[in-house]
Amino acid sequence: METTEGKNDLRAKLAEKIQTFRSQRKATEKVDRALLLQRRKEKAKARAEAKKLAKKESKAKQESKVAAYDTGNSSDNIADEENDNHKSTITYGTLIVGDDKFSNGKLKVAGKKRGPTDVFGALKHLEAKKRRIESMDEEKRRKIEESDKWHRVLLQAEGKKLKDNEQLLKKSIRRKEKEKKKSSDAWKERKDNEKKAMLMRQQRREENLKKRRESKKSKKGKAPKKKKPSKKK
């Protein structure tokens, strides 16, 4: 039988294990909370930097307009700038950041923007954007690339999936086409099997009908002949 001292030792060891487990669980919870707070700080910092960048771009745009006006070519320069911005669908005083929009340094909540939801549409959109950017001058390309960079940073911070990698999109399309072909082949094979099964059923039916007809003919041929009545003398 166990002594009282032995039981006390077991209880002490069990209590120690429980305490260790609780300490480890609390430490894990602290790490998870610290990680969550760190992510929130990074997201807030990225938003603040994006807002700061939008203010700088807005200020540079205003200074550019003033300089153009001072040279006496304000109307033509502003008109050209607005036309270029309209064609390239880029407004330098506006920066899209995740689901938010910074316009002239002020945060505006952006409505849901409809865009390509499938990889085929995403690839076409990316290729068209690439061609459009390549046709622009170096300054416009730089501004668009800077805006896109912040956009990617914030989307990644929010854990959203990016669809701006041309190679990955093409790889995804090849995989989908392969799956589509596999599905098409399976559908064709199923239809062929159904057709073969139908032909086999039809063939068995015709064979059964033929056997029945032959059986009826055979029975008629074996039927006994009726005896003629004998003549009375």
From Swiss-Prot:
Belongs to the SURF6 family. One of its GO terms (cellular component) is nucleolus. The gene is rrp14c. Involved in ribosome biogenesis and cell polarity. Required for the synthesis of both 40S and 60S ribosomal subunits and may also play some direct role in correct positioning of the mitotic spindle during mitosis. Keywords: Coiled coil, Nucleus, Phosphoprotein, Ribosome biogenesis, rRNA processing. This is Ribosomal RNA-processing protein 14-C. One of its GO terms (biological process) is ribosomal large subunit biogenesis. Residues 32-65, 122-223 form a coiled coil. Residues 210-233 have a biased composition (Basic residues). The keyword Phosphoprotein applies. Residues 47-87, 130-149, 164-233 are annotated as: Disordered. PANTHER family: SURFEIT LOCUS PROTEIN 6. Pfam families: SURF6. One of its GO terms (molecular function) is DNA binding. It comes from Schizosaccharomyces pombe (strain 972 / ATCC 24843) (Fission yeast). Its main location: nucleus. Component of the 90S and 60S pre-ribosomal particles. Residues 47-64, 133-149, 180-209 have a biased composition (Basic and acidic residues). The modification Phosphoserine is found at residue 75. It is found in: Nucleus, Nucleolus.
